[in-house]
Amino acid sequence: MLIPSKLSRPVRLDHTVVRERLLAKLSGANNFRLALITSPAGYGKTTLISQWAAGKNDIGWYSLDEGDNQQERFASYLIATVQQATNGHCAICETMAQKRQYASLTSLFAQLFIELAEWHSPLYLVIDDYHLITNPVIHESMRFFIRHQPENLTLVVLSRNLPQLGIANLRVRDQLLEIGSQQLAFTHQEAKQFFDCRLSSPIEAAESSRICDDVSGWATALQLIALSARQNTHSAHKSARRLAGINASHLSDYLVDEVLDNVDLATRHFLLKSAILRSMNDALITRVTGEENGQMRLEEIERQGLFLQRMDDTGEWFCYHPLFGNFLRQRCQWELAAELPEIHRAAAESWMAQGFPSEAIHHALAAGDALMLRDILLNHAWSLFNHSELSLLEESLKALPWDSLLENPQLVLLQAWLMQSQHRYGEVNTLLARAEHEIKDIREGTMHAEFNALRAQVAINDGNPDEAERLAKLALEELPPGWFYSRIVATSVLGEVLHCKGELTRSLALMQQTEQMARQHDVWHYALWSLIQQSEILFAQGFLQTAWETQEKAFQLINEQHLEQLPMHEFLVRIRAQLLWAWARLDEAEASARSGIEVLSSYQPQQQLQCLAMLIQCSLARGDLDNARSQLNRLENLLGNGKYHSDWISNANKVRVIYWQMTGDKAAAANWLRHTAKPEFANNHFLQGQWRNIARAQILLGEFEPAEIVLEELNENARSLRLMSDLNRNLLLLNQLYWQAGRKSDAQRVLLDALKLANRTGFISHFVIEGEAMAQQLRQLIQLNTLPELEQHRAQRILREINQHHRHKFAHFDENFVERLLNHPEVPELIRTSPLTQREWQVLGLIYSGYSNEQIAGELEVAATTIKTHIRNLYQKLGVAHRQAAVQHAQKLLKMMGYGV
């Protein structure tokens, strides 16, 4: 829940000097990316910008405090500021920020700019007190923000120092509007106006000018002088002389003498107690100070000029000037040290009563009250966890003694989930084991079941499916029906375990159950995970169209719940890329893989391994070996600098081995084969994939017998487990083995099986990557004219893809080939006496390659009627009557010239 006062622009106070000369400079702020107002405390930065902002509608204001160094908190408030300025225009980003569904601040800002592209009027965002930000991630993100923000947006930053926002670059490019302390300092005229507003008896212009010079135009000093003069403690000029030459860091003594010592004791205590609040309203003041009518007391303090300012138009929220607030907090620690814990406890209770647990935790920590902190966490920690307030929770749990955690195992579980979310799997098990050892009766019942559900998730993440299955089953046996989150976790883990074991039908049912439960209870990341798993299972079963439809449901869920920034989004676009690749939609597959890389742009490069492998697959299917080699260099570098799941390694190895096959690199294949892992089983798609990689390398090396043993066993497992996509891939590799071993009838038999199975899977590219050997076999099958209609159509499609991407279009019918053919002693006399033109040779090559008339016309960029004329002429010259005879004639010519076809 966001504190309204942090998003409210300060109210323009009466009796303030209107800074006309500075407002004139700010009037052109819309021409700059950044308006930067910098000065030490007390120079009137906030007052100036609140004057400038008055009357503007498309403006948002964000007042920072120390707690805003948490990235999630900063993001929530900044997006809320944009929503304030745009009247709710950026709904997607607002949801993403509220639910913490973004990978990083920069990716959230990128989505923000997409939404703001439709906002065309000038827009202003004010960030006050930016000097409080010390988090380098936020600095880097704000540099990204400034580099990429829309032209119609101006960021206004108020800071006591020069922020780390790439200022020099903006200055060089004339995209920076700067106002510093020298410009903020009051002029003689402004000082005279100031005193005339504040003092009942005006002072002479000359004296006003001398006072202004004595304090170098420092607004806070002028305010203190006016306060002293009203309290009749000193003359204005005497106060000015005392303040001359000092700065904000040396004000404490002066403020004690001139402010605190000149108010009654009740007001002094009111100031000191209320200063612990970063923002305050009537209820907070009443609870913290013990005084009734808190609102009236605040308004009285404001009238006395004691550095209190309103934070919103309603007048409900107030805060002290930062300079004065810091001073009061220091004095409170000295003067009210014994009472301070109780004051913080009162503040925490009041914040809790108003529904702000994050602020309550801040005061409970300051009070050192472990019991209060424990109670807040017991009531609100899971809500904070689900909103990704992870840093705050971690700090809070560290502040609790271990005994307190043991007395409340729910907090131990929370700490373990925090570790799990940060991939600290070993620490999770250590923590839970320690807790179980020390907590009586924890080894049974609901809490033990929740521990087991979390342990099961850790085990499957850590690649231990047997342990994950055991723990998930135990959890489901012991969990009551109402413990929905842990039941979702355990059900999901059990479904994933069954997927790993190849029990696809049971796994699919559990993942569908997980999806249903997760949707019912709004646990959207598990709903998305279950859909991704369902798609993978359906793909493995060979139901690619149903897998596609399941992916569509997942994309819809991402859009509805704004999950675009979750790393799981990359998983989804990657399996979409795999499906598109299988169907030879290579451009779309490549685009999906690149979008996956974009989702992971803020993560370690190792996370991009799978998408990079997919890009290499696209290059290989196109026959673009140069590009594949370049990408492989990067992939192999990543492989050597990370620890990966076996599925990831299998996919990476797949593109390496295919590349070696295409380039004939037997040395690389042999070296890899000596060192690669040989899995114990082959009962899921990634283990099947690794064994297929091994068989492909063996075929390349001519080790046909061991490769055949591997592939036959893979096929047996695939058939028994209904891994139909793997069976389709295995048959294609077995076809290559038989073809290269000279077992042409066996090769044809398994190719026919593969073509038939492809009616279910829709595979195209899996055939294409086998290149010319596949093309030769498909040409023969097409010429036999015995294929069923669906298989005939698919064979022609595959042949076209091979011809398109693997550069076999006219390789045998170019000018050099024709010249050698005509000089060959066995060339048919008909061709000598009536030679074909070069264009007719090209057409014959395309006919031989399986092109239709329309495709030949498109390839040669001529009209279809022209192609018909060429075909008629070459038929006459060759003495053939139809297309199949022309193909057979071309094949004879190629054999005569020594080409294996």
Swiss-Prot record:
Q: Where is the HTH luxR-type domain positioned along the sequence?
A: 829-894
User: What residues are annotated to bind DNA?
Assistant: 853-872
One molecular function GO term is: DNA binding
How is this protein's activity kept under control? Activated by ATP and maltotriose, which are both required for DNA binding.
Q: Which UniProt keywords apply?
A: Activator, ATP-binding, Carbohydrate metabolism, DNA-binding, Nucleotide-binding, Transcription, Transcription regulation
Q: Which GO terms describe its biological process?
A: positive regulation of carbohydrate metabolic process; positive regulation of DNA-templated transcription
**Binding-site list for ATP:** 39-46
How is this protein organized at the quaternary level?
Monomer in solution. Oligomerizes to an active state in the presence of the positive effectors ATP and maltotriose.
The entry's function note states: Positively regulates the transcription of the maltose regulon whose gene products are responsible for uptake and catabolism of malto-oligosaccharides. Specifically binds to the promoter region of its target genes, recognizing a short DNA motif called the MalT box.
Q: Which protein is depicted?
A: HTH-type transcriptional regulator MalT
Q: What gene, per UniProt, encodes this protein?
A: malT
